[in-house]
Design a protein with these regions (language model features):
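Extended alpha-helical targeting/anchoring segments
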Residues: 1-186
Length: 186
């Protein structure tokens, strides 16, 4: 199973994707380009591709880029769909189950990372850094309920919910990482 609910900021509405015709997963850096070529071909045929490329896939694009181990999630995963349905996230009502999250990174490692980032900025190795870290927690809430809660707490033009048999991704990003439109990448 690979289903998705995506906010279309151009149309100001939600699109639901179910019944994937195929699913493409990259578990190694070498697999990432193959997956991206496959979805590009499908999109050129008028199909929809929904998925993600993780930050941990960086070395697939430039071997000089350092990344943390990917863990159990694929480096990239996309599903191909023949159509999308207009939808709303209304079917996913927030539950009353508590969600307590704690950072996986320790305070000392966090401080060391911030100092390293400042060093990169001062030396000109980077002009911008998006420092992220994982949070871990337990809840009885469904992934859909968590996504609904996040959408209400932080409305975003780039919200996406992906649910598979093995994991769910709830994203309420305020920014677009990249977009491909014909021969243009922005």
């Amino acid at each position: 199973m690979f289903e998705a609910l995506i906010y279309d900021s151009d149309e100001q509405g939600w699109l639901r994707f179910t019944g994937a015709s195929s699913i493409h997963v990259a578990k190694t850096s070498d697999d990432v380009a193959v997956v991206l070529d496959t979805i590009e071909a499908a999109c050129s045929e008028g199909k929809y591709a929904v998925g993600y490329v993780s930050f941990e896939a960086a070395s697939a694009f430039d071997s000089a880029l350092v990344h943390h181990p990917a863990g159990s999630l694929p480096l990239a995963a996309f599903a191909i769909f023949d159509h999308a349905e207009e939808a709303s996230p209304g079917g996913m009502e927030p539950g009353s189950e508590p969600l307590e999250l704690a950072p996986v990174i320790g305070e000392s490692s966090f401080g060391d990372s911030i100092q390293q980032i400042k060093s990169y900025l001062r030396s000109g190795d980077s002009y911008q850094v998006n420092f992220t870290h994982r949070l871990k927690g337990k809840t009885a809430a469904s992934p859909g309920s968590i996504f609904s809660f996040l959408c209400r707490a932080q409305p975003s033009p780039y919200s996406a919910f992906i649910e598979t048999d093995d994991y769910a991704i709830c994203s309420v990003s305020p920014e677009l990482f990249f977009e491909v439109n014909g021969a243009s990448i922005r």
